[in-house]
Amino acid sequence: MRLIKAARVILFGAPGVGKGTQSERLLSRFPQLNTISTGDLLRHNVKNRTPLGIKVESTMKSGGLVADDLMLRLISNELFTRGWLKGQGPPSVMMLASEAITSEHSAYRQPPIDSFVASPFHHDEGMPPRVSDDPAASFILDGFPRTAPQAGNLDKIVPINLVVSIKTPLSVIIKRIAGRWVHEPSGRVYNTSFNAPRVPGRDDITGEPLIQRADDAEDVYRTRFRKFQETSEPVLEHYAKKGVLVEVEGMSSDEISPKLYAEFEKRFVQ
């Protein structure tokens, strides 16, 4: 199905609610839609030992959060690199993008990492970047924002025009995560109840072993769920005030997907 204008989307939901499954289905149904994963951008830099990757590696390994300024610059530079933002770009560009984009720009000289991180993110308020409304500039942003201040700063870079809060009962999610297996290097997620790997315990793409995450244990998950509720509420309120928040409820991914499709078609197809 073809989009007629750019969709700039964030999916919100508790861990295990099925955001990854819904993203994959949306990408399949709407070919112009792309995904921008801040986690993938960071992992790519760490894997390739870029100056940026070296800087954030210890923070990521310890489970800490990368500084907001750096995350905002990652997103901004990715959008400028893809051509989805026009105008005065960020003051410096590190290794930020997917392998294809990185390869294309591999001759670029990287600025010192300290100056990249130390200078706060900003853009010229008098000359805000122009956001492409080309349907090919459609994306789902994954992993950011996590707080209301982050959402406010993201607004200054690119206006998100749809935020979907996906809701499934806690008891259903707990049962679901009991069957969840993960390919840790790529982040691919499987479930023995649905979307099972072709070979039990092995990743479909690489054949490497799958693991069950320690934080999927029920007691740990309940703590994560409460924390998600506390932190997500102000973010959702922010987007509700912007008039772009939609809630979608369902007991399963198959129940949720048609509702998501309908929302996309109403906003970006018709």
Describe the predicted segments one by one.
Residues M1-Q270:
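Glycine-rich phosphate-binding loop of ATP-dependent small-molecule kinases
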